[in-house]
């Protein structure tokens, strides 16, 4: 009887070990990482484009309401003034390329939750919630590719406008994660 239990246990272990191995993430070696990042060592200069509704009134991006320098409603009212009427991604990329930069990174969504494209996960985006009424990210990405530059996309996981994100401002929270872990999990799935 004991032998049967041991054999059965070993058989189960052998059968499931292949499943676990298939789901394991292969760790990148230092050599693989160096090869993947080689371009970055040679790039020397990159331009980070930090652009969003905060450009309307020239406030210090979404930290201005988070740090309570101005009320959230006043900060978000910039959506109605964010027309992007002078937005010219070709001119931006001409300038970035002329500067000698080899890559650029753009903020696709900052902590305020406003996305520069029509995301299906939120109506808080430049197409549905701003005066621009259009996708501002795709034209930028297309120009980066035309100019032969590397591209980075900055996407903030923090989203102070999302009702399920616990922290609202520096001093205000919507809820305590310990008291409502289901709500936190709901945000994480967002």
Model-derived regions, located:
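Bacterial Sec-dependent N-terminal signal peptides
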Residues: 1-24
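Mature catalytic domains of secreted/periplasmic carbohydrate-active enzymes
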Residues: 22-190
């Amino acid at each position: 009887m004991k032998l049967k239990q041991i054999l059965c246990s070993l058989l189960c272990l052998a059968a499931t070990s292949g499943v676990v191995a298939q789901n394991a993430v292969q760790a990148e070696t230092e050599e693989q990482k160096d090869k993947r990042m080689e371009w970055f060592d040679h790039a020397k200069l990159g331009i980070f484009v930090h652009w969003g509704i905060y450009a309307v009134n020239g406030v210090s991006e979404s930290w201005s309401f988070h740090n309570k320098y101005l009320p959230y409603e006043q900060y978000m009212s910039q959506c109605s003034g964010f027309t992007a009427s002078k937005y010219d991604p070709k001119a931006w990329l001409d300038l970035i390329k002329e500067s000698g930069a080899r890559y650029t990174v753009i903020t696709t969504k900052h902590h305020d939750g406003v996305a520069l494209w029509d995301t299906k996960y939120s109506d808080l985006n430049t197409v549905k919630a701003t005066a621009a009424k259009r996708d501002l990210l795709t034209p930028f990405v297309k120009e980066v590719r035309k100019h032969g530059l590397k591209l980075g996309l900055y996407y903030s996981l923090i989203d102070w406008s999302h009702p399920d994100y616990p922290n609202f401002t520096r001093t205000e929270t919507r809820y305590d994660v310990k008291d409502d872990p289901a709500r936190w999990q709901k945000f994480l799935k967002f």
